[in-house]
Structure formats: structure tokens, C-alpha cells
A protein has these predicted regions:
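Structured-RNA-binding interfaces characteristic of tRNA pseudouridine synthases
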Residues: 1-179
Length: 179
């Protein structure tokens, strides 16, 4: 039986960038990584220099055209093979993912890219964000973005952005795993 101080105790031994907010009892065979049915990531971008956001968000100087970027996001939701956004040297051979939603949002003076999928490839979100920023800068047209996804070739996609703005924000599991 876990006592009332369990969350406090576990958080006291976890690294500073990880925290437990709650817990649920699950079946013995439940697997936190492979049992999830969806995951949501947020990539944070700020445009005003702020030392408190350093190493927590991407500082981006250009103007962000949310409408244009969200047009490109529609391509992600209607696609299923994301080899173009995967690491090149990888041992996996299945690049299929089901994107539930992908969108850019304004949050106060900052921006968030929010994406949910049944699974993600290694480096996928950071590569997608880098490529979407190239669409924003008009280095890549919407038509070219669509071709990048269709061609399944990492060389066509934009650069990966830094990991410092990437956050796993939500994981969903089937109700059958809970006790």
C-alpha cells in the first residue's frame, strides 16, 4: 500500500526535469511504453529574447504565419508514412504512424506546435518542426512539403530543431489496463 507521501518521496529522488503528478494502479502486464494508444508532444517557440526560456524553448526571430504552417499540418494528418522525418541511421523498418492532430498555436507571446500520434519515430517531431519552419520562411512550398512526405526521403526535409523545446505532454492508455 502506498502512503500519502508517495508522490513527494518519488519526486525527491527524480531528476529536476521529471516529476510525478499522480498515479494509477494497472494490470501486471501493463507496459508504459508499448501499451500507450496515443502520445502528445508540444514543441515550444518564443520570439522575444528571454533568459528564463533559454534551453526550454526555441528562440525564433522570424514572423510566424500560423495559417500557412497549419495548412502544412493538414498534410501530416492525412499521411501515414513518416520516413522523411525519421533519423537516417535507424534499425526500424516501419515508418507508419497515425497522426491524430498537428497544429501551431499562439500562446501569449509564444507559439506551440502540438502533435498527437499513436507512435513517433526517433527525431520525428523535431524534424517536422524544422521543416514546418522552412515552410513558414517560404524555403519550401506547401506543394513541396507534400512531396517531401510522399518521397519518404529524409534528405528532402528541413533540419531538426534543438531538443530543448520538446515536451511529452500527454500519454493515453486503453481503459482495460487499469485496475
Amino acid at each position: 500500500m502506498l502512503d500519502n507521501n508517495f508522490i513527494y518521496k518519488i519526486n525527491s529522488i527524480l531528476p529536476a526535469d521529471i516529476s510525478v503528478n499522480g498515479f494509477n494502479k494497472v494490470q501486471g502486464e501493463a507496459n508504459a511504453r508499448f501499451g500507450a494508444i496515443s502520445r502528445e508532444y508540444i514543441y515550444k517557440i518564443h520570439q522575444n529574447k528571454n533568459p528564463f526560456l533559454n534551453n526550454r524553448s526555441l528562440f525564433y526571430k522570424g514572423t510566424i504565419n500560423i495559417r500557412l504552417i497549419n495548412e502544412a499540418c493538414k498534410v501530416l494528418v492525412t499521411s501515414s508514412d513518416f520516413q522523411s522525418f525519421s533519423k537516417v541511421k535507424t534499425e526500424i523498418n516501419n515508418f507508419k504512424c497515425v497522426i491524430n492532430y498537428a497544429r501551431f498555436e499562439k500562446s501569449n507571446d509564444n507559439f506551440n506546435f502540438v502533435i498527437s500520434s499513436n507512435r513517433f519515430l526517433r527525431g520525428m517531431v523535431r524534424c517536422i518542426v524544422g521543416t514546418l519552419l522552412e515552410v513558414n520562411e517560404k524555403k519550401i512550398s506547401l506543394k513541396e512539403f507534400n512531396k517531401i512526405v510522399e518521397n519518404k526521403d529524409r534528405k528532402g526535409a528541413g533540419p531538426s530543431v534543438l531538443a530543448s523545446g520538446l515536451y511529452l505532454s500527454k500519454v493515453e492508455y486503453p481503459s482495460s489496463i487499469y485496475i
